[in-house]
Amino acid sequence: MPADKRVSSIDLLRGVVMVIMALDHVRDFFHADAFHHAPDDLDHVSAATFLTRWITHYCAPVFVFLAGTSAWFVHRRRTTTQLSSFLVKRGIWLVFVEAVIISFLWTFNPTLPAIFLGVIWAIGISMIALAGLVHLPARGILLFGLVLVLGHNALDDLHPAGLWWGILHEQVFRMVDGRLIGFIYPLIPWIGVMALGYVFGGLYAPERDPAQRRRLLRLLGMASIALFLVLRLTDVYGDPRPWEPGRGPAFAFLSVLNATKYPPSLHYLLMTLGPAFLFLSVAEARPGPWARRLIVFGRVPFFYYVMHLVVIHAFAILAVVLLGRPWTDMVLDTFVIREPHLQDYGFSLPVVYGVWVAVVVLLYPACRWFAQLKRERTDWWWLSYL
C-alpha cells in the first residue's frame, strides 16, 4: 500500500457518519419536539425521535477515532517530529475554527458573546495531546488510551469545584470575561479515543495481511458489543445513567440504548465503536456507486462539517420566511433549541428527514469539487488543514 494511498473503507465509514451527523443537526433546527424535550428523554419523546437521535451517536466517536487513524497515516510519510508539529498546528487551527467560525454558524449572530466548543474543539485538543503521545512506543499510546476510555467512569462521582474539571470531565457552561463559553465535549475520554484510533491505524500497515485484518476487525467489533451488553445489562460499571427495566420491553430496549454521551461513557463508546469495527471488516470490497458517493464525503470531512452548518442554517432561515416569520428569527441569542421565540416553531419528523436528504444532496457537488481540488493541488500545503 503506497504511503499516499487512501483506504476506501475508512473514507466510506467516515462518509457514512458525516451524512448521519447532518440528520442530528437538521433535527436541531427543524423538529418541533427539539424545542421542548431532549431527544433522549424517554418519558416525553417518541421512539422514532429517540432513534433519530440515537443513530447519530455513531458520529462523534467514529469521527474522533478515525482522526487518530488519519494521524497514523500521516506518520507514514513524515517523521515523528514533523507529525507532532503538524498535529499541534492543526489542533490549534481546529480550536480557533470551533470558537470563531463554527460558533457563528450555529447562531448567525456576530455580536453574540458566546462560544460553543463541541466535537471540533475536542478533536483539536485531542490532536495537541496526541502530538506528545506519538513520541511514545505504540504500546504506551495504547495503554494510555485504554486507561482513559476504560477508566474515566471511575471519576463519575467526583465533582470538584472549578472550571478545569468541567472542561476535562463534565459538560459545563460558564461566563468567562463576560462571554458565555459552553464546554460541550469534556476532554478526557475523547483524548483516549483519538489515542486508540492512532494505534488502530497499525492494522492498515502494508505488511498486514488483509484477511487477518478483517478477522481482527470482526473480533474487535463482536468483543466490544458483547462487553457493552454485559456491562449495560448488569450496570456494574461504565455509565452513570442505568437502564430502566420494569416499564415494558420497548421502553427497556430503548433505555439500554440510552447511554451517556457527555462525557461519552464506556457503554456509549463500546456501543458505537463496536459496530464501526464490524462495518470496516466488511467494507473492503470494491465500492459500488452509492458507496463511492459516500466516500466523497469521507475524504473532505472538515469541509463538509463547515458547509453542512451553513446550508442547514440557511434552510432554517428559508423555513421561517415561508412560515411568515421574520428571517431574523434564525439570528440566535443562544443555542437554537433553547431560543425562547422559537418555542412555537418546528416541523414533524418526516419533514426533518426530507430536509436532511436535501442538505446532503446539495452538499455532494461541492464536496466532490473540493475532493478533486485536494487531489490535484498537492502543492497547496494549506489544503492539508482543511
Place the predicted regions along the sequence by residue.
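Alpha-helical transmembrane segments and their immediate juxtamembrane cytosolic regions
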Residues: 1-386
